[in-house]
Design a protein with these regions (language model features):
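N-terminal alpha/beta PP-like core and its mobile active-site loop of ThDP/TPP-dependent enzymes
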Residues: 2-369, 414, 494-496, 603
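N-terminal cationic-hydrophobic initiation segments that often serve targeting/anchoring roles
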Residues: 63, 156, 257, 409, ...
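Thiamine diphosphate
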Residues: 96, 100, 108-120, 287, ...
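A structural motif corresponding to the C-terminal end of an alpha-helix
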Residues: 132, 303, 407-416, 537-542
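Generic recognition of flexible, low-complexity loop/linker segments
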Residues: 153, 225-228, 252-253, 292-295, ...
Length: 606
């Protein structure tokens, strides 16, 4: 006789066997069977958010902090739709998350084409999710879950990782599954067809293969050999590491860089690859707000950029793409062939692309590292550039929030992860947060979703088992402020820092520069206002304190040393700014406020 089990019991057990023990979601009729199965499994726990978006961002934070798969769920209709911003966040930042939605009973479907809604809280969430998932499917027969769940898992966790969505009608949830399988494997052709069929209506795998073929090679050994040859010729090489090299790949690359004194520049999402004070750390590339020294080293000083899992999009290298690193050779390693279709050097002159895993290439480089020279003198040049340009920025009065972030980063201690929201505080944080070794800083990168940080920090706590922190602005914190109740209910040890300038500062800066200082909907008195967040936190039963920005060093230390959840609200001036900033049309290493010419000329000459 075949073994039989309830479908949602199988789903729960499958994910538990894969290492997922914490599930994030919000209860509802059409997802009740799944939640019941999670409750009855001795090795799993459901954590209820207060909006499904919070659950989705918690799953993103969990996946980022643990470098592994996460799961979030929601009921049908509005519950499922509320997940979508988190689904998009996982998609753009390559996070493997299994999203599960409840749905109307299949027997309630009318079969009438064009009917606006099949029943109460019914919505075609699969079609809505397809553009921001690697795979999305509705299960119409209970036994199909075995193949589809195994397939979805493999798709989420291989290649360029990302989210999948499984839509479960209520009657299917309570159905039975025969002969459950937990380790079904699929060929590359099967997974590619499943992922890419939606791109062109049926020839997805061929479409994907065509994109791969436009790279120079999909062979890791060939990519490693090209890099080794280029390193032999180079005098001023740089490793550029992005989120696509996350995990063991980045560790191997850092080890190689350390042994051979190769400077390392990262993307924002890969900001945690190196500790703040690591001698190899040459900052974060950024077309608008990157570190001055990173932008100068990459764009104007290096003669070889070896890029691992970094997209080199306009957000990173500026809008004048063909002018980036004109004097450098570029070798790009990326698992996503579509990223490699971005042409950096016009006509691909001095640019080689390899559609292959960064980890595979890193392993081959490590095996042949006796062929790599040491670049200690060049690293010293880069460290000098970092020191001198950091000093230039420290003398900029408008950067006082950066100094607060630097101080707070030392006060937050050994937090397992720090989630940062979207706004000016994000720039201040990735520019100035002094992260320790193995302390992760989490961002909503590609999607740039306000309201991300608090729930992401919650998810990171369950991923690491350690105290966590989040840094938010007054605009972003308001977006998912209801999750303070989640923090209180489960006594989550999260230190919340709200930097309150009573404005949407990033847009206010834009309005000052381009809209004649008309601050529509961004400032108090002009259509926007903020509350007293410390009072709100106290209403939830959470310890909270409100201080003025100039009092940070005197008033924050003892407060942040307490156990349990705490909120520190820091009042800033209304007119805050993020610097350095690249103006439209300028090279990314020539940011405002401009470097004094004698210093600029001297650094360009060394």
């Amino acid at each position: 006789m075949s073994d039989k089990m309830k479908l949602t019991d199988y789903v729960t057990e499958f994910l538990q066997k894969k290492g997922i023990h914490d599930f994030f979601g919000y209860q509802g009729t059409m997802i009740a069977h799944l939640v019941d199965s999670i409750e009855h499994n001795a090795n799993t726990k459901s954590h209820s958010s207060y909006n499904e978006q919070g659950a989705a961002f918690a799953a993103c934070g969990y996946a980022q902090a643990k470098d592994s798969c996460a799961c979030a769920y929601a009921t049908s209709g509005p519950g499922a739709v509320n997940l979508l911003s988190g689904v998009a966040d996982a998609y753009f930042d390559s996070l493997p998350v299994i999203f599960i939605t409840g749905q109307l009973n299949t027997y309630e479907y009318s079969g009438i084409d064009g009917l606006r809604q099949q029943g109460f809280q019914e919505i075609d969430i699969v079609s809505m999710a397809k553009p921001v998932t690697k795979y999305a499917v509705q299960i119409r027969e209970a036994q199909d879950i075995v193949r589809e769940l195994n397939l979805a898992w493999q798709i989420a966790n291989t290649g360029r990782k990302g989210p999948v969505l499984i839509d479960l009608p209520m009657n299917i949830q309570r159905g039975e599954v025969s002969d459950p399988v937990y380790d079904m494997k699929f060929s590359d052709e099967e997974t590619e067809a499943a992922v890419y069929n939606r791109k062109d209506g049926g020839n997805g795998a061929a479409f994907y293969r065509e994109a791969v073929d436009k790279a120079d090679s999909a062979d890791a050994a060939e990519a490693a050999e090209e890099i080794l040859c280029k390193l032999k010729e180079a005098k001023r090489p740089v490793f550029m590491i992005g989120h696509g090299a996350a995990g063991s790949g980045e560790k191997i690359l850092v080890d190689i860089a350390r042994k051979h004194q190769i400077p390392v520049i990262t993307s924002v999402l890969a900001r945690s690859v190196l500790a703040w004070d690591d001698p190899l750390n040459c900052g974060c590339i950024g077309g608008a707000y990157g570190h001055r020294y990173a932008n100068m080293i990459a764009n104007a000083k290096s003669d070889l950029l070896v890029c691992f899992g970094i997209s080199l999009c306009t957000r990173q290298i500026g809008t004048k793409v063909h002018e980036f690193a004109r004097c450098a050779q570029i070798v790009r390693v990326d698992i996503d062939p579509y990223n490699l279709q971005r042409e950096i050097h016009e006509g691909r002159e001095g640019e080689k692309c390899f559609c292959v895993s960064a980890e595979d290439v890193a392993e081959r480089l490590a095996a042949a590292e006796s062929r790599i020279s040491s670049y200690g003198d060049w690293l010293e040049v880069c460290r000098r550039i970092r020191r001198e340009l950091t000093q230039v920025d420290n003398e900029t009065p408008e950067r006082y929030p950066n100094r607060m972030i630097a101080y707070l980063s030392d006060q937050l201690g050994d937090t397992g992860a720090v989630a940062v929201d979207v706004g000016q505080h994000m720039v201040w944080s990735y520019q100035s947060f002094h992260n320790k070794q193995d302390q992760k800083i989490l961002f909503s990168g590609g999607h740039g979703a306000m309201g991300y940080a608090l729930p992401a920090a919650i998810g990171a706590h369950y991923a690491t088992g350690k105290p966590v922190a989040c840094i938010c602005g007054d605009g972003a914190f308001q977006m998912n402020i209801q999750e303070l109740q989640w923090v209180k209910r489960e006594n989550i040890p999260v230190k919340m820092v709200v930097m309150n300038n009573e404005a949407l500062g990033m847009i206010r800066h834009l309005q000052r520069d381009y809209f004649d200082c008309v601050y529509a909907d961004t400032s108090d008195g002009s259509g926007f206002s903020s509350c007293d967040f410390s009072d709100v936190a106290k209403a939830y039963g959470i310890r909270a304190k409100r201080i003025q920005g100039e009092d940070v060093e005197n008033a924050s230390g003892e407060f942040l040393e307490q156990n349990g959840p705490e909120l520190l609200e820091i009042m800033l001036e209304n007119g805050t700014y993020a610097y350095p900033k690249t103006c439209l049309g300028e090279p990314i290493h020539n940011q405002q406020p401009y470097i004094p010419k004698p210093i600029f000329d001297e650094l360009m000459e060394i």
